[in-house]
Amino acid sequence: MKNNNLTYEKSGVNIKAADNFVKFISSLSKKRQNNKNFQNIGGFGSITNIPKNIKNPQIVASTDGVGTKIEIANELNKFDTIGIDLVAMCVNDLIVQGAKPIIFLDYISINKINLRKLNKIIKGINRGCKISNCELVGGETAEMPGTYSKGKFDIAGFSVGLVDKKKVLDKSKIKVNDLIIGIPSSGVHSNGFSLIRYILKKKKIKLKKNKFLKKELMKPTKIYVKEILKLVDKKLINGCVNITGGGFEGNIVRILPAKLSAQIYLYKVKPKNIFKWLHSQGVSDKEMIRTFNCGIGFCVIIKQQNFKKIKKYFTKDFQPYVIGKIVNGKQNINLNGKIEW
């Protein structure tokens, strides 16, 4: 006799829970959408208009995740800001080319649909989109029993931005004697967490009982969209760098023209307390610099005469300051002095 009791739900996939999550996302999205073309979450694809004020639009796309910061979120059972991190990691890359973020999509894979957890994550994503002035237009939630262990998940984001061809920030605009301006980070952002978790494990630090680390490690990545796009609009910058994994050396080199180098004055960098703590745990200067942002989350390359002009576009906590300059060379990053931990 045949047994016809096999169902998708018995295999570990709850379609009804997934549908309820889509409805929740749609309700969030509709609250802040002004353009009817955006109201299509749950469809097969998302449609949007190209803003009329961008005369010769160039498309810029970026995708990223938040790495093992999700493990810290899981340990602390705190999921309301990890979505902001996800948006930040994508849109901060878009603005390096001078692009305005237009749309954002997310991908969440999880062992079992947990609406409480997922609702908090998506609220954070929605908040990140609001800060970035872009729209959450869709995504994918994959319930994957057997792939992830109990309670585990991963998230990824994808964002598209537009920039007028005449305003694209490319290497050709960067010249000798341009200043390298550091813009403070909000903290660790979303890079280096595998090393942080290794330190916590090796030092047997109980994260839940450490108020300082709980607060610092879950601070959301700073989104620089508003400030940088104002500078692009005012034609005050020649280049941008998002300081992520690889630190100063691994990221600044990516925007240098072939015959130019960067001089970085490490002694001018102002490390936040979390970086001082990490250094005190036995992480060498070299490892700190190539793994973490060390207090500088974003850099802009500007003409010397524009420094005073850009300061007014930043709040008190994110006031920019000079950390280096562009010199002749062969795409080298020259690190001068030491960071004062």
In which residue ranges do the predicted regions lie?
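Residue-level detector of flexible, active-site-proximal loop/helix-junction positions
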Residues: 22, 54, 67, 143, ...
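Glycine-rich phosphate/pyrophosphate-binding loop regions near the starts of catalytic domains
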Residues: 27-186
